[in-house]
Amino acid sequence: EGFDAWILRTVTKVNPKTVPSLPEELKFIGSASAGTDHIDKEYLSHNGIQFDHSPGCNANAVAEYVLTSMLTWCSSTRGELTNHKVGIIGMGHTGVALAKKLQAIGVSYAGYDPPKALREESFRSCHLDTLKDCDILSFHLPYIDQGRYPTHHFMPDILSLSPKHKLIINAARGGIIKEDYLLRHNELIALSNKKISFILDVWETEPVPDKVLVNQAFIATPHIAGYSKQAKIQASKGVLRRLLSHFDSEWTDSKLQHKQMDSTKNKLGEASNCGFNKKTNTLILSVL
């Protein structure tokens, strides 16, 4: 309490269960992150609280993680990435960043994003059948569990594995791929020597992933693909600019006061100590 705004990160969930009573003076919540699935936006809207975040802040970091992972996998198979076709599922900030990097080194790719095709006349999404002919699939979708284009268990509900697939990468959100499906698939074809490799940075059961899946993954990481120093700075500055705009204030470095906090602690009380007081026009920043 005592703040007009909260600046949070993805480790802090805001919904009726975690925060059953929101302070009356709270008017803005900003998340220094690209994703928003940790925030119940309808709950905030119902309480008259505006929400904003930093879309695309870690796109380059994630794209570099994915490209490096692809090259590492190719090296392990004594193959070359230019001899593989990559299917990019989700052509938002990260998907586009990855596409540019692949194009720069001569790798063929196909981008799948029907919702984007509806929004932007200049973009054409590939067909699902095209993805079945790709050697590598990289997922860059937001987590959506309802509506016209849900992404929950996109694989296998919308796209199933095909004989052409060799590598599956998910550095987007846990739950987009049904993890049991990957394990069952590899169990069924274990004797044929055609197991699919997978690289996972996100998990259905975060923060504790399935140990069997971790052991079988070619690369397994704890949701850190976007954790570059530059990405964190961009995330922080992006959400702070939006916060200041909400309160009709201009961005100046003199308004920043840095406060060191333990980013590993998942307590809303401590996260809420990072806030904005419009009476003093001061930001207390702990997200850098």
Language-model segments: residues:
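Rossmann-like dinucleotide-binding domain for NAD(H)/NADP(H)
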Residues: 165-288
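NAD(P)-binding Rossmann-fold cofactor-contacting core
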Residues: 104-121
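Oxidoreductase and adenylate-handling cofactor-binding alpha/beta cores
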Residues: 63-79, 104-107, 238-245
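Glycine-rich adenosine-cofactor-binding loop
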Residues: 55, 63, 80-103
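Phosphate/diphosphate ligand-binding glycine-rich loop within oxidoreductases
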Residues: 4-78
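Rossmann-like adenosine-cofactor binding region
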Residues: 14-18, 116-211
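Phosphate-coordination loops involved in phosphoryl transfer and adenosine-cofactor binding
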Residues: 26, 82-86, 165
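N-terminal glycine-/charge-rich "phosphate-binding" loop or analogous flexible N-terminal tail
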Residues: 1-5, 110
